């Protein structure tokens, strides 16, 4: 029986490919990763980097959840990328009812926008806020006015 090696990590396939040293030194043939919130598959012919996507807050997939099923034919693993619609309005309602909206209104507004549109992840918005603040303060101390301005400029209501 020939044994295949797999590796699961929390990182992005884009970052892995840009890190040629990592890919060159990695002995595993299959690298399964996440964290980018987007499904994807890349291969250099020898190694395969597979991103399952995101169940909770996927990017580029509005009002849908993503997952992946790996199947083997005994020689190779093949990813099947799946996406299912779910009741985003109920999720947003539950965020409001949980009290999270009161505790972290900007995070909630960004999340609501992302769930509805599949666009503008939290990191992108945070970078915009920090740029408006001229990188003077750590993110948790940035004044609300910068958050409001950033969300307004990005079209997040």
Language model regions located:
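Short, conserved active-site entrance elements at the starts or edges of catalytic domains
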Residues: 10-34
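Acidic, His/Gly-rich catalytic cores of divalent-metal-dependent hydrolytic chemistry
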Residues: 43-52, 56-157
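Residue-level recognition of beta-strand microenvironments
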Residues: 39-41
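Generic hydrophobic/packing signal
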Residues: 5, 14, 29, 66-68
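Residue-level preference for short coil/turn positions at secondary-structure junctions
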Residues: 1, 26-27, 45
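Active-site neighborhood of phospho(di)ester-bond hydrolases with catalytic His/Asp-centered motifs
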Residues: 30-37, 49-53
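Single conserved hydrophobic/aromatic residue that forms the stacking wall/gate
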Residues: 1-9
């Amino acid at each position: 029986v020939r044994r295949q090696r797999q590796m699961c990590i929390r990182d992005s396939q884009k970052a892995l490919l840009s890190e040629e040293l990592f890919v060159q030194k990695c002995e595993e043939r299959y690298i399964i990763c996440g964290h980018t919130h987007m499904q994807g598959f890349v291969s250099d012919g020898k190694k395969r980097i597979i991103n399952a996507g995101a169940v909770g807050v996927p990017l580029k997939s509005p009002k849908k959840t993503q997952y992946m099923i790996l199947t083997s034919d005994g020689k190779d693993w093949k990813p099947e990328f799946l996406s299912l619609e779910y009741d985003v309005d109920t999720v947003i309602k539950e965020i409001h009812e949980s009290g999270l909206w009161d505790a972290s209104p900007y995070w909630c507004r960004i999340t609501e926008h992302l769930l509805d549109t599949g666009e503008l992840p939290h990191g992108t918005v945070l970078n915009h806020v920090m740029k408006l603040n001229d990188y003077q303060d750590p993110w948790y101390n940035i004044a609300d006015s910068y958050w409001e301005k950033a969300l307004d400029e990005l079209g997040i209501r």
